[in-house]
Amino acid sequence: MWFGRDVISARDFSREDLYELFEMAKYMEKFAKSRVDFLRGKVMATAFFEPSTRTRLSFEVAMKRLGGDVIGFGSAEGTSVEKGETLADTIRMLDAYADVIVIRHKYEGAAKLAAEVAESPVVNGGDGAYNHPTQAMLDVYTIWREFGHVDGLNVGLMGDLRNARTINSLVETLANFNVRLYFISPEFLRPRAETVDYARDKGVKMSFHTNVEEVVHELDVLYVVRIQKERFLDPLEYERVKGSYRVTLELLKNAKRGLIVLHPLPRVDEIDHRIDSTPHAKYFIQAALGVPLRMALIYLILSPP
């Protein structure tokens, strides 16, 4: 049951919830380039205190495709926040205008606070370095759509697994399924202990690797996030490490024929651009599916069963 629910953490949603969302997203794909009146008269407020391109635009397009209206802001600049207004007061004002609120914020816990203040449902569009539940739902939807199932797949997660909020939410979402996870990163950029412990407690099999070459032949999915330069004190060490976590044509020679490569975008140089034209590249499809997935999410939240 999705009606009236907040979407704050990936941990709040079951396997059954996800399948219901995926089936609705598949249905919504036929309307992703048109306009319907499913949510005519409804208003979505976007409160993006942190920059975003794909998440904000896909939510806005999704609401407009459903026949609803959008208000809000893509930056705190020019809003009352600059005058010192608290997050809680900003949310209270948006709550008075809208039927659903989508928030992105640099501080972890901001979406939870918004949900406590607002009477309307609140959707977390990314807060702090930990939560990005709708991106994870999109990622797993892409996997489900490509393979027809999620159970039984070997999923590799590569790059800065500690500081990418997409990784935390993705691991927690995949924990609903019978998958094997391969964490591929420098040791000091392994995922947070609480994320690993959560998945392990749910029975997920996993292993840790510093070299992608040793496991690429086993993978069905390779999910890539960038190595963040700002995490390194030594620029030379960054360059050395970064080069070890790139997806190249040479690497994929040893991959399964059906391997798919995903990336939450934007990418820097962690995926060779020549891979874009190969059957492995699914990251642009993944981004495009953000609209029907979020159409389904908004529709389920705002529509009584």
Curated annotation (Swiss-Prot):
Note the HAMAP family from the entry: Asp_carb_tr (MF_00001)
Q: In which pathway does it act?
A: Pyrimidine metabolism; UMP biosynthesis via de novo pathway; (S)-dihydroorotate from bicarbonate: step 2/3
Decide whether keyword Transferase is in the record.
Answer: yes
What name appears for this protein in its UniProt entry?
Aspartate carbamoyltransferase catalytic subunit
Family annotation (InterPro entries): Asp/Orn_carbamoyltranf_P-bd, Asp/Orn_carbamoylTrfase, Asp/Orn_carbamoylTrfase_sf, Asp_carbamoyltransf, Asp_carbamoyltransf_Asp/Orn-bd
What the protein does? Catalyzes the condensation of carbamoyl phosphate and aspartate to form carbamoyl aspartate and inorganic phosphate, the committed step in the de novo pyrimidine nucleotide biosynthesis pathway.
Source organism: Pyrobaculum calidifontis (strain DSM 21063 / JCM 11548 / VA1)
Catalytic reactions on record: carbamoyl phosphate + L-aspartate = N-carbamoyl-L-aspartate + phosphate + H(+)
